[in-house]
Amino acid sequence: MKLWLILGAISGFISVALGAFAAHGLQARVGPAEIAAFETGARYQMYHALALFAVAWVAAQGGGSLASLAGWAFVAGTILFSGSLYYLGITGSRALVLITPIGGVSFLIGWASLAVGAYALRLPGSGG
């Protein structure tokens, strides 16, 4: 559980820092399309930084391997999806564009794993 809290906090921090860089440091270097791609990467990184807090909660409630799968899928998705968009935004190069959808699939695996893991929990007063 502690790992997911730490990774979520670090990822959120990086997302805010990179979002600020996009807003204040990229305009002179690249065009609007590259800035938009970079901002999309930062936005999705923040979404999944917050998702890691949900992973920590499910793990703390006994979500076990499904929570871990979700967490690692979110981390992989952030590296692949957001990372490839950061690269595009900074360099203007589309060399890593084929990695972006792999990161998106990692995000989907994470959300599905989190949903199944949460569904399987036995919480007091939940009737299941």
Task: Enumerate the language-model features and the residues they cover.
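Polytopic transmembrane helical bundles with strong interfacial aromatic enrichment
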Residues: 1-128
